[in-house]
Amino acid sequence: MSKNPLYANEIATAHQFVIEHNTDIKLQNFLHDMRYRTDLTHSDRWSLCYDFLNENYPEASGTIVTGLAYWLED
């Protein structure tokens, strides 16, 4: 997972979001699939996170999308 210090707050917010929704199988499957996608650029990963969260968690903020995209990067 990315340790990019410029996005530490966003990553922490995304991590908290994942903890709060840890029983959601859709979210867990999405996270698992994204972890092993080595073919994605950051922009691709951000777009997929945005689409997933917009569809399943429309209340999720842009901070969560950005944090999740960085958190899932190696």
Region annotations inferred by a language model:
Residues 2-23:
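Short terminal alpha-helical segments
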Residues 16-74:
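Acidic, low-complexity, intrinsically disordered interaction modules
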